[in-house]
């Protein structure tokens, strides 16, 4: 079981087959991450599984940030040097991915919002 901020990419694969998940790349230094945080908290409250990738950040600051703003993530991966992000093709934070099984169905660069959710993610979920 993975909890808190961990450094194991295996945590992503522990979810049930055919379940949709979100992977959100975030950091405490990212102003836009704060702007989309309410959206992520709402999705968590709707029952969505959201995996966080804390990107090129300070671990202590990340814990403080989650304590202050709330933690929408079921699991957080700590990517201090950007290795996981590099492997995903991350260009910066925030970025959000829609996952099903081991496949990336959608990638959104920038702030997640209801409009982005409805325009880019819902059609793939309903398909």
Predicted regions and their residues:
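Hydrophobic beta-strand anchors of alpha/beta hydrolase catalytic cores
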Residues: 22-23, 50, 96
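Thiol/disulfide oxidoreductase modules built on the thioredoxin-like
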Residues: 68-72, 79-125
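Active-site-proximal beta-strand/loop segments in catalytic clefts of secreted hydrolases
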Residues: 25-27, 53-56, 79-81, 109-111
């Amino acid at each position: 079981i993975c909890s808190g901020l961990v450094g194991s990419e295996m945590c992503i694969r522990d979810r049930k087959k055919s379940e949709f998940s979100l992977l959100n790349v975030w950091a405490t230094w990212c102003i836009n991450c704060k702007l989309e945080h309410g959206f992520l908290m709402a999705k968590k409250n709707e029952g969505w599984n959201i995996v966080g990738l804390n990107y090129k950040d300070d671990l202590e600051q990340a814990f403080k940030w989650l304590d202050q703003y709330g933690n929408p993530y079921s699991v957080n991966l700590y990517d201090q040097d950007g290795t996981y992000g590099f492997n995903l093709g991350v260009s910066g934070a925030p970025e959000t991915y829609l996952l099903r099984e081991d496949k990336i169905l959608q990638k959104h660069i920038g702030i997640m919002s209801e409009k982005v959710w409805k325009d880019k993610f819902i059609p793939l979920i309903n398909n």
